[in-house]
Amino acid sequence: FNNAQGMRTSREIIETAFSDIISPRDVWSVTVCAYRGDSIRESFSKMTSKRLGYMEDTYEFFVIANESQTLQNYADFRALKYRIGAGRSGRRLYSAEEFSKRQREVHEMYLLLCEYCNSQRDDTDFYSRTSLWMKRQYLLMLVTDWVTRLPAADQDKGYTAIVETWGAADAAIMLFDPLIARGESLLSKNSIPPGNDEFYRWGQILAKIVPMVDDGRNLPRYDQYRQLEQALEHHVAEIQLKEQQALQAEQERIEAQARFKKGTLMRRVIDKVMPAGSLNRDLVSVIRSHAQRAKRER
């Protein structure tokens, strides 16, 4: 965190942590900052009195950043060591029920964040854009948890909870990131993925959601996914064709080798019984010649 970015003031503070306007972006971690007493008490007085759940620090730091007037970055400052992303839950796997509960908590917190943004009377367009940006971040974090922390057997059930909580459109949009990334990864490999690969499993989940959203016509990146799906089908077909051709070539090689070995043995027998130049050998040659001529004349 020890980035020497100098002083941030007013609107810059929230833009630094909650937008892509200023780079590099600051993290929204309440625990890596020191606060002036009056300022932080004033910020907390503007927050909801409701109990927050999973990822609650995003809401807290959003309000703090918006209410603050100055943010000073200090380089080479050593204090509490905090591991971003390990939080209260660590990195263990979730059950479908636990994931469902946590994603509901995030959605409830997002609604509270929107409520706070709507209470800001100046520059409503800015707060509308910022809350929408936060929504995308929440969806991205949730789908990352869904991919990495839910067993494959629970992912279908977990995504049903997302659809019920966030709606079909948002649920479909958040699925495109891992789905397209997985498809592009498969497309770069010279191998045929198994039928239960994540790309196919996640695609089946998406197929259930798309009919709820006007058949996907209004979904960003849906066309990109469909093109990728077709490209992967073509890619797999090409690999299968090459494998079949290689198998056929190998079979022909084995058969030719067998014929060669058989022919070699027969030639040895003929050479032994009817040596070259012998009357019997010449007689056989004449008979074969007449037989071939008769065959051509028919």
Protein language model regions, located:
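Donor-binding/catalytic cores of nucleotide-activated saccharide
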Residues: F1-D76, L80-S100
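Short, basic/polar, glycine-containing "phosphate-handling" surface segments that engage DNA
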Residues: W28, Y127-S128
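Inter-helical turn/loop segments and adjacent helix faces that build the functional surface
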Residues: M47-K50, S119-F126
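P-loop NTPase catalytic cores that bind/hydrolyze ATP
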Residues: D57-Q69, S131-V147
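Catalytic core of nucleotide-sugar-dependent glycosyltransferases
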Residues: R78-A86, R92-D123, Q137-I173
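Membrane-interface aromatic/basic loop that binds lipid-linked glycans or pyrophosphate carriers
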Residues: V143-R298
